[in-house]
């Protein structure tokens, strides 16, 4: 009798179009793409379909600028990925899959101060409002992702700038707000949720 092992997760895959509503030229990505113009021949990206996995999209080449989480599904125009973000971007120019080794047991610890100092709080669930759950400050000085991948937002209700925080990048350690992302100018985080695969 042979034993069949369970299949692993499907590889990350997304398709990009240079026009809204999945029109125009397209390009399929299966791995990191630092510049979709050079690799895929697209001058801009106006619609996206995530077929497998979760992805982080950046408004500039080389994984720079505002981050946008793209989970499985269709994004027919810029408003679908910008949502209620405080920053609206009608262009996405670099992409990478989210590294998420252990989503089923996601854990993150928030710290009041930089370098993991001060009051701390461990989370294992989604929180649409950190202040309402007892976090006294509007800011998070540092954080450690023990497992999984998270997306933190500037404001309650999953609004404002997005920061994708993964256990498998930076060893899960973000010593100060500037390590949250290239666009991070403040440690203001007021809601956080697990990345959905």
From Swiss-Prot:
Keywords: Eye lens protein, Repeat. GO terms for molecular function: identical protein binding; structural constituent of eye lens. Has a two-domain beta-structure, folded into four very similar Greek key motifs. This is Beta-crystallin A2. Crystallins are the dominant structural components of the vertebrate eye lens. Homo/heterodimer, or complexes of higher-order. The structure of beta-crystallin oligomers seems to be stabilized through interactions between the N-terminal arms. The keyword Chaperone does not apply. Residues 12-52, 53-99, 106-147, 148-196 form the Beta/gamma crystallin 'Greek key' domain. Residues 100-105 are annotated as: Connecting peptide. One of its GO terms (biological process) is lens development in camera-type eye. Residues 1-11 are annotated as: N-terminal arm. Belongs to the beta/gamma-crystallin family.
